[in-house]
C-alpha cells in the first residue's frame, strides 16, 4: 500500500473498528491496497476488451461475406461495449471514490446483463422479427438506467485527489 511504501507502520489500535459508532480511522482506509480500491475500474476495462473482440469478429465476419445487415449490432457492441465500458473503467480507475459505490456495481451489472440480449434482439429486429421491437425498447430503457447510474455516480462521487 501507499502508506506502507512510505515506510510507516500502522499502529495496531488504528486498525480497530469501533462498531458502536462505526468510525474507521483514516489510516485504516489508507492501508487498503490500491488495487482493491480500484478493482471496479479494472472489471470494466476487462469486460470492455471482451466486447472489443466480439465486435471485431462480427465486423470481420460481415466483411468476409459482404453482408452488412448486422452493422448496427456491430456498432452498438463496439460503442456500448468497448468504448463506453473502457471509458467508464478509466474514470473509475482515476477516481476510486466513485469506484467503491453501489452505483458503480449497479452500472456494471445492468450494463453487462442487458447488452448481450439487447444485441441479440437488435439482430432479430434487423432481420425482420417485428415482435423484437417492444423488447428492444425495454432493453434500451434498462440500458439507459444503467448509464444513468454511471452519470449520477460520476457527478456525485468523482472528486479530485487530495
For each feature predicted by the language model, list its residue ranges:
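Hydrophobic alpha-helical transmembrane segments of multi-pass integral membrane proteins
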Residues: 2-6, 11, 17-19, 23-162
Amino acid at each position: 500500500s501507499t502508506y506502507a511504501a512510505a515506510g510507516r507502520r500502522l499502529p495496531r489500535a488504528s486498525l480497530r473498528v469501533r462498531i458502536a459508532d462505526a468510525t474507521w480511522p483514516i489510516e485504516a482506509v489508507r492501508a487498503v491496497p490500491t488495487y482493491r480500491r480500484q478493482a471496479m475500474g479494472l472489471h470494466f476495462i476487462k469486460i470492455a476488451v471482451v466486447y472489443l473482440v466480439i465486435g471485431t469478429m462480427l465486423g470481420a465476419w460481415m466483411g468476409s461475406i459482404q453482408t452488412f445487415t448486422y452493422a448496427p449490432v456491430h456498432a452498438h457492441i463496439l460503442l456500448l461495449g468497448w468504448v463506453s465500458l473502457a471509458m467508464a473503467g478509466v474514470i473509475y480507475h482515476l477516481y476510486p471514490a466513485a469506484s467503491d459505490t453501489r452505483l458503480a456495481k449497479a452500472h456494471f451489472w445492468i450494463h453487462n446483463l442487458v447488452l448481450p440480449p439487447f444485441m441479440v434482439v437488435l439482430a432479430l429486429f434487423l432481420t425482420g422479427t417485428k415482435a423484437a421491437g417492444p423488447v428492444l425498447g425495454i432493453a434500451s430503457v434498462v440500458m439507459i438506467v444503467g448509464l444513468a447510474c454511471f452519470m449520477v455516480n460520476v457527478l456525485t462521487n468523482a472528486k479530485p485527489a487530495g
